[in-house]
Amino acid sequence: MKQQATNYYYGDEQVSVVELPYGNGAFSLVLFMPSDKKKTSLDELIADLDADRWNQWMSNLSSYSFDLYLPRFTMESSMDLTDVMRTLGVKDAFKSEADFTNISTEQPLFIGLIKQNTFIKVDESGTEAAAVTIVDMDTSALPPATTLKELRFDHPFGYVLKENSTGAILFAGRVD
């Protein structure tokens, strides 16, 4: 799909980043890809991506007017987070002795499964995203735009859907 608009852009010898604000500006889709896919791969960009680099990208975004070429994409995933939570130190909640009396006093409860399903779709009408986390309880204002001709997301790229007032990342993924 092609979009002709003014959006935020940052680019250097390694990365091209574009931020697409949504609606009243509460949310944005941030897309990033290697500036030169022969010199840097998406895997290398992601491996080097940390909070400092992310903040550098976000603070250097400037308003540009350009043609944006972006493929339509849909991503879905389902992930069992039980082992992840145990690794993070959540242990007692999985034991039959867990204390969930604020949820139910009739039967002892414990967590048997934590599963997250995610969905994101990007097309001409915008972005649709949803996340469902299942916990199974078992008994027991824009500055003037600079002109950039075009930006084509025609090789592997990453995407981040974020909430703008806090910067919280809601979804992140890659399109190969």
Where are these regions (language model features)?
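Mature hydrolase/peptidase catalytic cores and their serpin-fold inhibitory cores, especially
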Residues: 1-176
